[in-house]
Amino acid sequence: MNIGSAPVTLGQLTKGIVTHGFDDLPVFGMTLDSRKVRDGDLFLAISGQAVDGRDFINQAYERGAVAVLAETPVKTENDSRTVVAIDELSKYAGLIANRFYNYPSKHIRVVGVTGTNGKTTCCHILAQALNELGSCASVIGTIGNGVLGALRDNSLTTPDVLSVHQELSKNLSEEADVVCMEVSSHALDQNRVDGVLFDVAVFTNLSQDHLDYHHDMTSYGKAKSKLFQIKSLSSCVINIDDVFGCQLSQLIEPELLWTYGVSEQARVRQLLAKVERNHIRIDCRVNGAVVEIKAPLAGAFNVSNVLAVFTTLMAMGYSSNKAVESLLATRPVPGRMELIDVLGKPLVVIDFAHTPDALDNVLKNCRGLTQGKVWVVFGCGGDRDKGKRPQMGAVASQLADHAIITNDNPRHEKPELIAADICAGMNGRQQVCLDRKQAIAQALKNAGKDDLILIAGKGHETDQDFGSYKQSFSDRAVVAELFELRQ
């Protein structure tokens, strides 16, 4: 729906999907959440993984819904209200959203980034680089949605399908010409990006996560691969050092394919990488020439992220020289290998690492940043993949000198049981302190000034989820308070 234009009618939204007697009914907004319904809105009642929208049709009407599209079978009596039943409504939600928001992805270039780790960093570094190249780039993802510097809060890595198209429409109104979107496996499996005309798809890596949802790595990889089957794609950027990425690349049309990695078969091949405390240098071979890339980022794992962004810029039509220049101007992403370096204090690293592979990578990088001991403070999220908990505990035992197990976002699980799952994979030398602030304070108090403390799992987050309530909490703010720093 264009701002200032006439409202869209229900008939326009459902044309070719279902017939009903309400074609001329004006629709002023749309939502999948009955709590967000406003006067004149259309409510889509869809059965989800945890909640069935059909249970909330009455609440939607009480809040002012003008009509309801409901997945069959409808669970409420229609009486005189406008309830339109549609078989497999979720399959049409993307089309309906596109019609309401006037096909926003037709008017803006969309880059989708998927993978277990690196999505946020790649999207934000890519957006920064594109801005340096004269674009107005926005992001949709974990840290927030919108143009950089003015992000709106986002509760999901990839929003629901209606919100995705709404965000794209907002990006257009903010004069963005490129959107860098994190695309989670959940989003792909649940059709949350249906109808989005992606121009470029990027694959970073695949390692264990979300098996509470996907059950096995085969299903997890299959969900990720859906992004690369979208017909609007002009380029596919794939890390072929990753086993699944290598397999995925073989399914892509050669004219669309841009590969990167240390592999000799990579179109952008890494030859050399040098990592310093706040700086990365990569020598790579592109089109027969050796190119030197520099970026002001910490951590060896960011070599792959920078290479992904460089390759994406090439795939989007920028020269290697322009891509190199743009990456020089990028800055670290909040909560991703974020360093807090205070004279006379232990070096603190805040990172979002919440998978075994990510924790392994970050701890290995932390070891190279200090001559002292490495401490790690972390927990695991509740209501999430339980299988990774002992694995993360094992990683911490192997790679850190001291480990303090604490709360992450316990949600509806008992924190002490989550901690026990983590400790099951450990060597018995760990400490457990479930109060996250106290755990951080304990590490800061006991670490030497030459030591390093990794606070992992929450990164940029500013609240802590206890299921029935959330409380304000920021790892960065806690460290600043304990170090008596000005925010």
Specify the residue positions occupied by each region the protein language model found:
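ATP-dependent carboxylate-amine ligase
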Residues: 1-18, 39-42, 55, 253-256, ...
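Acidic, Mg2+-coordinating active-site environments of NTP-dependent enzymes
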Residues: 11, 70, 74-80, 174, ...
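Short gly/ser/thr-rich secondary-structure transition/capping motifs
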Residues: 20-30, 93-96, 159-162, 181-188, ...
